[in-house]
A protein has these predicted regions:
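N-terminal secretory signal peptides that target proteins for export/translocation
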Residues: 1-6
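Bacterial N-terminal signal peptides
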Residues: 9-22
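Histidine-acidic metal/acid-base catalytic patches
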Residues: 25-45, 49-67, 183-197, 203-290
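Active-site acidic/histidine proton-transfer and metal-coordination neighborhood
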Residues: 25-28, 94-95, 100-197, 203-207, ...
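Active-site-adjacent substrate/metal-binding segments within catalytic domains
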Residues: 69-79, 108-109, 113-117
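Glycine-rich, proline-tolerant flexible connector loops at the mouths of alpha/beta enzymes
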Residues: 70-96
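A short acidic, helix-capping loop that chelates divalent metal ions and anchors anionic groups
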Residues: 76-83, 168-172, 204, 231-236
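Alpha-helix N-cap and loop-to-helix initiation/capping positions
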Residues: 84-93, 118, 125, 173-181, ...
Length: 290
């Protein structure tokens, strides 16, 4: 075969290799066993932050959610209320948590919102913690540490999502609420660095979640899902589908973009007695998938 005839084959092979290489570090697909209504949905432990982590795991199982997102520094258990759980805890504490998760058939998938140090050794502790528990995503607001943790994202193949809290009129320098700002931070970074889309905080900031999700298309790596009673900073959580956040529209847009999770139910109302409300959120998700 002459060089002219061979050239298209070589170019095709090179393109195939490049295509393969571009997906070489893609996160593995979410197991069907962790999906509800086509999405991976679980509870954010903050929903039960008035309780210990062991109790939060029990309540997550009671809700019928297969997954949980850890928060840093939650008290471990009723038996050990002075022990805190985080990436800085000794391994024996991690082992106890892993055993409790197995007992309740709950899978940890994310951790946050957690701060990142610019010190590589300190940042690595968070990734080692995530690796131990098999987490998919770490959620943070530490934009200033992105140069520190981006190499660790590549090394560990673990995603990092930038979380948004509401707009702060008294702190105009806070920009995490703005999806355009988040996009500017992540668009030229490793694709495993993206947005942890908190839909409720967007509503509290006067934004429509579906519009925000479209702005961040292809750059959402996790989500904290909320439906609020009113589109105001004072708005509080209601079961999905009963508020103003357009949860169906959010799920439709996630589905259109191919985003399957992790999605965390973060219910910040009826503290101490919100398991029934969280169950209704799971029911909405199941009905959506039918």
């Amino acid at each position: 075969m002459g060089m002219k005839a061979l050239l298209p084959s070589l170019l095709g092979a090179s393109a195939a290799l490049l295509f393969t290489a571009s997906f070489a570090h893609a996160a593995p697909p979410i197991p069907d066993s962790l999906k509800t209504g086509g999405f991976e949905v679980g509870c954010q432990a903050w929903t039960f932050h008035d309780f210990t982590l062991f109790e939060a795991i029990e309540k997550t199982a009671e809700v019928g959610a297969p997954t949980i997102e850890f928060i840093p520094n939650q008290k471990l258990s009723p038996e050990e209320p002075t022990v805190q759980f985080s990436h800085n805890s000794p391994k024996e504490v991690w082992d106890k948590v892993k055993a409790k998760l197995a007992e309740k058939h709950v899978t940890p998938v994310a951790y946050g919102v957690v701060g990142f140090s610019k010190d590589e050794a300190e940042a690595r502790k968070i990734f080692e913690f995530a690796k131990y528990f098999g987490l998919q995503t770490i959620n943070t607001e530490a934009v200033d540490a992105i140069d520190t943790f981006e190499p660790l994202v590549k090394e560990y193949d673990i995603k990092v999502g930038f979380h948004d809290h509401p707009k702060r009129p008294d702190h105009p320098e806070y920009r995490m609420w703005d999806p355009e700002y988040i996009l500017s931070v992540v668009k030229d970074r490793d694709p495993r660095i993206g947005s942890c889309a908190d839909t409720g905080h967007w509503v509290r900031s006067g934004l429509k979640p579906v519009d925000c999700i479209r702005i961040l298309k292809g750059h959402i790596v996790s989500s904290h899902m909320k439906d609020l009673n009113v589109p105001l900073p004072s708005g509080h959580d209601v079961p999905w589908g009963q508020g103003v956040s357009d949860v169906k529209g959010i799920l439709d847009e996630y589905k259109a973009q191919g985003f399957e999770g992790p999605i965390s139910i973060e219910y910040e109302y009826n503290w101490g007695k919100n398991v029934p409300d969280a169950k209704l959120c799971m029911d909405f998700r199941r009905a959506y998938g039918k």
